[in-house]
């Protein structure tokens, strides 16, 4: 059975390139192409794709907002962000919204094919640079927690009082 993929991308050339590479695969088919967020939001649930490739900054709506709304309605669908944004705010907002993967548009098209396969199997595909940023974020958080654990009881009490004003 083929993996059913939908594309939400307002750049018509990139949208078509994604469709072409998906349809070229024997185990995948592009079941829908959307060039704006409004149509995607209205129609995706009825199509029931296995995987959705979602741009973040569409002309009319935020791809992150669309993912947030649709993940509850479509729990069996994996959403992969496919965007040019590589900043931490966008990455973590997309993942918190329910995206299962995050790719940058500069990735080779075969990486996108592999990401679709990975997401369909329950994985969390990410571009190399994105995965590195996610790891760094958690490593920085670990250092902050370790630093707090080095404080004495009195120092922790002072910090608590300072935080309360």
Feature map (PLM): residue ranges:
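Conserved acidic carboxylate
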Residues: 9
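Acidic, metal-coordinating helix/loop segments flanking the phosphotransfer/catalytic sites
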Residues: 33-51
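Active-site residues of response regulator receiver
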Residues: 55, 83
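Acidic catalytic/metal-coordinating carboxylates
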Residues: 36, 62-65
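Regulatory hinge/linker segments at domain boundaries
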Residues: 135-161
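The feature encodes the CheY-like receiver
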Residues: 59
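Short amphipathic alpha-helix used as the core "switch/output" element in two-component signaling
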Residues: 64-76
């Amino acid at each position: 059975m083929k993996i059913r993929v939908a594309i939400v991308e307002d750049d018509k050339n990139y949208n078509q390139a994604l469709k072409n590479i998906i349809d070229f695969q024997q185990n995948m088919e592009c079941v829908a192409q959307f060039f704006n967020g409004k149509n995607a939001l209205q129609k995706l649930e009825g199509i029931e794709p296995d995987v959705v490739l979602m741009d973040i900054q569409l002309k009319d709506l935020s791809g992150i907002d669309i993912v947030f709304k649709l993940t509850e309605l479509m729990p069996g669908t994996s959403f992969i962000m496919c965007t040019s944004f590589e900043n931490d705010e966008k990455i973590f907002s997309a993942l918190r919204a329910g995206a299962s993967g995050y790719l940058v548009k500069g990735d080779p098209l075969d990486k996108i094919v592999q990401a679709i396969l990975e997401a369909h199997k329950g994985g969390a595909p990410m571009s190399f640079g994105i995965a590195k940023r996610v790891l760094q974020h958690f490593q920085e958080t670990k250092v902050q927690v370790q630093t707090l654990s080095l404080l004495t009881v009195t120092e922790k009490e002072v910090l608590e009082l300072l935080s309360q004003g």
